[in-house]
Amino acid sequence: MPAKRNAAPKDVSSATIGFEAKLWLAADKLRNNMDAAEYKHVVLGLIFLKYISDTFEEHRAKLIAGKGDYAGANAEDPDEYKAENVFWVPADARWSHLQASAKQPTIGKIVDDAMVAIERDNPRLKGVLPKDYARPALDKHRLGELIDVIATIELLASSQPSPQPSPTGRGSEHTELPSPLGRRAGDEGRHRSVDLLGRVYEYFLTRFASAEGKNGGQFYTPSCVVRCLVEMLGPYKGRIYDPCCGSGGMFVQSEKFVEAHGGRLGDISIYGQESNATTRRLAVMNLAIRGIEADFGPEHADTFRRDLHPDLRADFVLANPPFNDSDWFRKDDDVRWQFGVPPKGNANFAWVQHFIHHLAPRGMVGFVLANGSMSSNQSGEGDIRRALIEADLVDCMVAMPGQLFYSTQIPVCLWFLTRNKNDGKRRDRRKQTLFSDARKLDTLIDRVHRELTNADLEKITSTYHAWRGDQRVAGPKTPAAKYADIAGFCKSATTAEIAAHGHVLTPGRYVGAEEVEDDGDPFEEKMPRLVAELLAQFAESAKLEKAIKANLRGLGYGG
């Protein structure tokens, strides 16, 4: 069941959410009876078109001014834009032309022609942009109104406050991102409207995922889950890989993390793969609208049938693979099955072994799986899990609250694996695994969905970093926090303890029960008081029952 349309994420400034929600409400009003799965491509395609047009116009103004490095530059030379990683936008594809034509009955064809022209002149975008705005089913009057709504982003940009760091101290919900190669269209002089477009795109992805319900999970992972994965691993430097990348949320959050911690963006490179062609297009636009470069391979492809990055050894793997996928391609002699051949009826441990196969010698991986993966012994899954534990790969397990996902009510967990628990940067964790039970850490955002707040994320991530002895997160001049087991929440267990539990990785097996604070009242005093309260409630219940029966008799019921 879809979430309420007007539900807004928590822990974000009211001014920011008010701006984004206003745009959403205006755009959603124009949806009329169109299915959300179809309408999202209409809206997101236009937001992307405005982004590249605004970026182009800003750089064009610099070239025309001809100051400094731009002296003598030709503003009509596409190479001047490509050299700065700015998309070239032909005159008839620029936003000013579209907005001026918004009231024309041919606006659908005008938008389609603009998309075709942009793809023609920018090979990186070939096959990415939606080009079906002229279809009869799309109301052209409403399309023109939608163009006017998106145009207001530029007008409202100057009134928005700068994004503030999140209360966790680990980054902002809305931080604008340079590219991993240190190149960024417009750099410091970039207009605020361009920055806000990235935020609007992200917000709209969230709302469309909510509107689509189960199908929304195909392209979107809840931001609190993504943040937890990223902040646990801390991808400061190296190659980041997501073999089932959806709309690219893991990559966007990784870049936010690097920027928030003063890392060098040039030290990060991104690799992704997505099997769904439509979702892959969303990912390309999502990263391009933020100036992030990524290698998605030449086209969409099933990761198990055709690995687009066969030689990649990543420093960080972040993923949210399909839960309990029974319809997947298995090759029994696949080189990736180092710990056992996964069952045909469930791809969970196929994904796990694919992640490990692509890990660098000191690499780390964080991913989401259904809770069954922690305890299942069906079809050899228990043997594979035992092999992973005996290989000392399992670093941390986190049980998550229910109802976090739009696509499923299945309880989920986070796995964190590492090839090297004694890397010299943190304490020696060999033969140890941290278990965290975060099932009680959540906030209800509507009647069917929950999310983790910044405080919840801080509790989970700081516990893990303290357990690892991670000096970087604490800061170079600040002693790392000391770790201690907390009954009901976290426990550091040895491999021997895990073996004694049958190699089950469910945190609840290890953390125990939460300590209940004693109110200090002696039992001899407490029990008579509780009995008196109970008897009083019985008496009140009998009184209410008598009154209800009398009312029913007065209505002719009950004899």
Question: Positions of the model-derived regions?
Answer:
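Non-catalytic, mostly N-terminal accessory regions of nucleic-acid modification and defense proteins
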Residues: 1-161, 173-174, 189-233, 295-308, ...
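Short, contiguous acidic/charged loop-to-helix segments that flank catalytic cores in large enzymes
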Residues: 33, 328-346, 371-381, 401-407, ...
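Conserved S-adenosyl-L-methionine
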Residues: 215-319, 324-328, 333-336, 345, ...
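Feature representing long, continuous alpha-helical segments
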Residues: 252, 281, 319, 349-353, ...
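Extended hydrophobic-aromatic, low-complexity segments
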Residues: 326-330, 366-367, 376-379, 397-398, ...
